[in-house]
């Protein structure tokens, strides 16, 4: 009997998180009160994965993933929406400096709803809206399981397209406005790539600070419409590259002050135009290179204008242990979006139509709004 009891207790302890013995009196049979638990599993998930690096339209595919255990410190999130960013494409191509090992699930930011939580999780409940903050790879799937520390709870009243896209691009715009030059109300900035999400955010965030923006766009079909859209966001001046074929581009500024700060995400001639606008001692910050052309700077720009060239990479900034600061800024940006003070173009695309969204994100169909997958 003793051996049998030891065997029962041993098995119970093996499969139970806690075991409580009742106090017994002489002649009573000891009983064991067991608090049982069952393993929490996520539902099966559908995901966009790539098993090798290459062109995204060739190496990505939709797969079914099995359920994943939700451990004691984990949160299982049912994804609501996730964007396709240029950095996502670069990761798949294998040219981004930081990328997950393959095979990998695509995506780096997004918004989801808490589906289940581990036994030690106290900060989240099913139904909460959350985003990975700082961003975390693997958001192009229907269910994501990651540790509690990865997730940041947000206001559910913010439109999902902004919640899904608030980190990578709007946060880049905010940091660049604050980290390089001490700007005051009445100052101005100049940027190329003004129709990008970062560009649109720069216009609106600068305007909230009383800072004017000079915006450069490419000559292409729809440029007049793009100019009007940027003006509606608060852009002070919008020029196409062909309008800048003048001897002194600063003559186009009118009453605007010469900018002390410029942003470049294109490279090539578009970067040179930004440099021409900068005042003596000005700074150009490069955060992208969409044209894949190098930046050429004249010797006179350095000697006679003392210009400074800097770079910004959000991933590097986030790696400096700034989780708290990151989340505070995200809440600020989400508040602006919720109140209609921060807007940008997005297109919601059902998960089943991912190939179409990818083609648009790759530029195969001309200029398109930010593609946001909905699950």
From Swiss-Prot:
Q: What is this protein called?
A: Enoyl-[acyl-carrier-protein] reductase, mitochondrial
Instruction: Give the catalysed reaction(s), semicolon-separated.
Output: a 2,3-saturated acyl-[ACP] + NADP(+) = a (2E)-enoyl-[ACP] + NADPH + H(+)
Transit peptide, first to last residue? Answer: 1-37
Entries under SMART domains matching the protein: PKS_ER
> For this UniProt entry, what is the primary localization, expressed as one broad class?
mitochondrion
Q: Source organism lineage?
A: Eukaryota, Viridiplantae, Streptophyta, Embryophyta, Tracheophyta
Top EC class for this record:
oxidoreductase
The biological process GO terms on file are: fatty acid biosynthetic process
Q: Name one Pfam family in it.
A: ADH_N
């Amino acid at each position: 009997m003793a051996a049998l009891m030891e065997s029962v207790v041993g098995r119970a302890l093996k499969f139970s998180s806690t075991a409580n013995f009742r106090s017994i009196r002489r002649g009573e049979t000891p009983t064991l009160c067991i608090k049982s638990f069952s393993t929490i599993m996520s539902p099966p998930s559908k995901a966009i994965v790539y098993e090798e690096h290459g062109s995204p339209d060739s190496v990505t595919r939709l797969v079914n993933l099995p359920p994943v255990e939700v451990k004691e410190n984990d949160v299982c999130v049912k994804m609501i929406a996730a964007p396709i960013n240029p950095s996502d494409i670069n990761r798949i191509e294998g040219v981004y400096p930081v990328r997950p090992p393959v095979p990998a699930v695509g995506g780096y930011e997004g918004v989801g709803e808490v589906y289940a939580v581990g036994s030690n999780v106290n900060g989240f409940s099913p139904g909460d809206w959350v985003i990975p903050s700082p961003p975390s790879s693997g958001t192009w799937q229907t269910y994501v399981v990651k540790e509690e520390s990865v997730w940041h709870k947000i206001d559910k009243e913010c439109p999902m397209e902004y919640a899904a896209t608030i980190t990578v691009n709007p946060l880049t715009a905010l940091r660049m406005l604050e980290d390089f030059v001490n700007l005051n109300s009445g100052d101005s900035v100049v940027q190329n790539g003004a129709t990008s999400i970062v560009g649109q955010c720069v216009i609106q965030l600068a305007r909230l600070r009383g800072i004017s923006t000079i915006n450069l766009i490419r000559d292409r079909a729809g440029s007049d419409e793009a100019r009007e859209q940027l003006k509606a966001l608060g852009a002070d001046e919008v020029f196409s590259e062909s309008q800048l074929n003048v001897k002194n581009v600063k003559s186009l500024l009118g009453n605007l002050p010469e900018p002390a700060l410029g942003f470049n995400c294109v490279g090539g001639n578009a970067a040179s135009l930004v440099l021409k606008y900068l005042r003596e001692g000005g700074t150009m910050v490069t955060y992208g290179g969409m044209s894949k052309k190098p930046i050429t700077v004249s010797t006179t720009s350095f000697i006679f204008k003392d210009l400074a060239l800097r770079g910004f990479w959000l991933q590097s900034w986030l790696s400096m242990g700034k989780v708290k600061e990151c989340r505070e800024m995200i809440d600020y940006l989400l508040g602006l979006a919720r109140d209609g003070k921060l807007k940008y173009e997005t297109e919601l695309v059902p998960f089943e139509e991912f190939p179409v969204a990818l083609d648009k994100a790759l530029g195969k169909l001309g200029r398109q709004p930010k593609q946001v997958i909905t699950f």
